Curated annotation (Swiss-Prot):
Catalyzes the conversion of (8S)-3',8-cyclo-7,8-dihydroguanosine 5'-triphosphate to cyclic pyranopterin monophosphate (cPMP). Its EC number is 4.6.1.17. One of its GO terms (molecular function) is cyclic pyranopterin monophosphate synthase activity. The gene is moaC. The lineage of its organism: Bacteria, Pseudomonadati, Pseudomonadota, Gammaproteobacteria, Alteromonadales. This is Cyclic pyranopterin monophosphate synthase.
Protein backbone atom coordinates (compact mmCIF):
# COMPACT_ATOMS: atom_id res chain seq x y z
CA UNK A 1 0.00 0.00 0.00
CA UNK A 2 1.29 3.45 -0.90
CA UNK A 3 2.08 6.02 1.78
CA UNK A 4 1.20 9.02 -0.41
CA UNK A 5 -1.88 10.33 -2.18
CA UNK A 6 -1.58 9.71 -5.92
CA UNK A 7 -3.97 12.52 -6.85
CA UNK A 8 -1.85 15.24 -5.19
CA UNK A 9 1.16 16.53 -7.15
CA UNK A 10 4.49 17.82 -5.77
CA UNK A 11 2.99 21.32 -5.42
CA UNK A 12 0.12 19.99 -3.32
CA UNK A 13 -2.46 20.45 -6.08
CA UNK A 14 -5.07 17.92 -7.10
CA UNK A 15 -4.42 16.37 -10.51
CA UNK A 16 -5.50 13.44 -12.62
CA UNK A 17 -2.95 10.61 -12.47
CA UNK A 18 -1.11 10.01 -15.75
CA UNK A 19 -1.65 6.36 -16.73
CA UNK A 20 -0.13 6.68 -20.22
CA UNK A 21 2.80 4.36 -19.52
CA UNK A 22 0.89 1.80 -17.45
CA UNK A 23 0.31 -1.66 -18.87
CA UNK A 24 -3.15 -2.82 -19.88
CA UNK A 25 -4.23 -5.56 -17.48
CA UNK A 26 -7.44 -7.27 -16.47
CA UNK A 27 -9.03 -5.28 -13.63
CA UNK A 28 -11.90 -6.24 -11.36
CA UNK A 29 -13.47 -4.71 -8.26
CA UNK A 30 -16.32 -5.72 -5.96
CA UNK A 31 -18.09 -3.41 -3.52
CA UNK A 32 -21.07 -3.52 -1.19
CA UNK A 33 -23.52 -1.24 0.57
CA UNK A 34 -26.43 -1.80 2.94
CA UNK A 35 -29.68 0.05 3.45
CA UNK A 36 -31.53 -0.54 6.71
CA UNK A 37 -35.28 -0.02 6.85
CA UNK A 38 -38.43 -0.89 8.75
CA UNK A 39 -39.77 -4.43 8.34
CA UNK A 40 -42.91 -3.10 6.63
CA UNK A 41 -40.87 -1.19 4.05
CA UNK A 42 -38.76 -4.24 3.29
CA UNK A 43 -41.88 -6.40 3.04
CA UNK A 44 -43.32 -3.99 0.44
CA UNK A 45 -40.18 -4.36 -1.65
CA UNK A 46 -40.06 -8.13 -1.28
CA UNK A 47 -43.72 -8.79 -2.13
CA UNK A 48 -43.81 -6.29 -5.00
CA UNK A 49 -46.53 -4.10 -3.51
CA UNK A 50 -44.54 -0.86 -3.63
CA UNK A 51 -46.52 1.73 -5.59
CA UNK A 52 -43.47 2.82 -7.64
CA UNK A 53 -42.91 -0.64 -9.09
CA UNK A 54 -40.01 -3.08 -8.93
CA UNK A 55 -37.58 -1.41 -6.54
CA UNK A 56 -34.78 -3.94 -7.06
CA UNK A 57 -34.95 -3.77 -10.87
CA UNK A 58 -34.82 0.02 -10.80
CA UNK A 59 -31.94 0.07 -8.28
CA UNK A 60 -30.01 -2.49 -10.34
CA UNK A 61 -30.29 -0.38 -13.51
CA UNK A 62 -29.38 2.78 -11.57
CA UNK A 63 -26.27 1.10 -10.18
CA UNK A 64 -25.17 -0.08 -13.61
CA UNK A 65 -25.74 3.38 -15.08
CA UNK A 66 -23.85 4.99 -12.18
CA UNK A 67 -20.80 2.79 -12.75
CA UNK A 68 -20.73 3.95 -16.37
CA UNK A 69 -20.97 7.61 -15.27
CA UNK A 70 -18.44 7.53 -12.42
CA UNK A 71 -15.94 9.83 -14.15
CA UNK A 72 -18.72 12.44 -14.47
CA UNK A 73 -19.29 12.32 -10.70
CA UNK A 74 -15.77 11.90 -9.26
CA UNK A 75 -13.62 14.71 -10.68
CA UNK A 76 -10.25 12.92 -10.97
CA UNK A 77 -11.53 9.52 -12.15
CA UNK A 78 -10.54 8.42 -15.63
CA UNK A 79 -13.38 7.66 -18.06
CA UNK A 80 -13.30 3.88 -18.47
CA UNK A 81 -14.57 1.41 -21.03
CA UNK A 82 -16.17 -1.07 -18.65
CA UNK A 83 -16.60 -4.58 -19.99
CA UNK A 84 -18.90 -5.81 -17.22
CA UNK A 85 -21.05 -4.26 -14.51
CA UNK A 86 -23.17 -6.43 -12.27
CA UNK A 87 -25.36 -5.23 -9.41
CA UNK A 88 -27.07 -7.71 -7.10
CA UNK A 89 -29.62 -6.92 -4.42
CA UNK A 90 -30.41 -9.26 -1.56
CA UNK A 91 -33.21 -8.70 0.92
CA UNK A 92 -32.08 -9.65 4.42
CA UNK A 93 -35.32 -9.68 6.44
CA UNK A 94 -33.54 -11.08 9.51
CA UNK A 95 -31.61 -7.76 9.65
CA UNK A 96 -34.33 -5.48 8.16
CA UNK A 97 -32.05 -4.43 5.34
CA UNK A 98 -30.99 -4.87 1.74
CA UNK A 99 -27.44 -5.81 0.82
CA UNK A 100 -26.21 -4.44 -2.49
CA UNK A 101 -23.13 -5.88 -4.16
CA UNK A 102 -21.49 -4.71 -7.34
CA UNK A 103 -18.85 -6.07 -9.68
CA UNK A 104 -17.02 -4.06 -12.34
CA UNK A 105 -14.48 -5.37 -14.86
CA UNK A 106 -12.33 -4.09 -17.68
CA UNK A 107 -9.06 -4.51 -19.51
CA UNK A 108 -7.28 -1.24 -18.95
CA UNK A 109 -4.61 0.92 -17.37
CA UNK A 110 -6.43 1.91 -14.19
CA UNK A 111 -8.64 0.19 -11.65
CA UNK A 112 -12.40 0.02 -11.33
CA UNK A 113 -12.76 0.43 -7.57
CA UNK A 114 -14.55 3.78 -7.81
CA UNK A 115 -16.96 2.40 -10.39
CA UNK A 116 -17.86 -0.55 -8.13
CA UNK A 117 -18.29 1.74 -5.10
CA UNK A 118 -20.40 4.18 -7.12
CA UNK A 119 -22.63 1.38 -8.43
CA UNK A 120 -23.35 0.07 -4.93
CA UNK A 121 -23.87 3.58 -3.52
CA UNK A 122 -26.25 4.76 -6.23
CA UNK A 123 -28.26 1.53 -6.07
CA UNK A 124 -28.71 2.18 -2.33
CA UNK A 125 -29.65 5.81 -2.99
CA UNK A 126 -32.20 4.65 -5.57
CA UNK A 127 -33.83 2.34 -3.03
CA UNK A 128 -34.00 5.29 -0.64
CA UNK A 129 -35.52 7.51 -3.33
CA UNK A 130 -38.16 4.97 -4.26
CA UNK A 131 -39.11 4.22 -0.64
CA UNK A 132 -38.83 7.65 1.01
CA UNK A 133 -42.59 8.25 0.70
CA UNK A 134 -43.22 5.39 3.13
CA UNK A 135 -40.08 5.76 5.29
CA UNK A 136 -37.70 8.68 5.59
CA UNK A 137 -35.34 7.31 8.26
CA UNK A 138 -33.73 4.52 6.24
CA UNK A 139 -29.97 4.28 6.79
CA UNK A 140 -27.39 3.68 4.06
CA UNK A 141 -24.24 2.24 5.60
CA UNK A 142 -21.11 0.14 5.24
CA UNK A 143 -20.27 1.20 1.71
CA UNK A 144 -16.93 -0.49 1.13
CA UNK A 145 -14.59 -2.13 -1.32
CA UNK A 146 -14.74 -5.90 -0.90
CA UNK A 147 -12.07 -6.92 -3.38
CA UNK A 148 -9.91 -5.66 -6.22
CA UNK A 149 -7.72 -7.55 -8.66
CA UNK A 150 -5.21 -6.45 -11.26
CA UNK A 151 -2.80 -3.60 -11.63
CA UNK A 152 0.44 -2.72 -9.92
CA UNK A 153 -0.96 -2.79 -6.38
CA UNK A 154 -2.12 -6.38 -6.85
CA UNK A 155 -4.91 -8.19 -5.06
CA UNK A 156 -6.87 -6.69 -2.16
CA UNK A 157 -9.58 -8.48 -0.21
CA UNK A 158 -11.41 -6.94 2.75
Amino acid sequence: MSNCFTHINADGNAHMVDVTEKAVTEREARAEAFIDMAPDTLAMIMNGSHHKGDVFATARIAGIQAAKKTSDLIPLCHPLMLTKVEVELEAQPEHNRVRITSLCKLSGKTGVEMEALTAASVAALTIYDMCKAVQKDMIISQVRLLEKRGGKSGHFKA
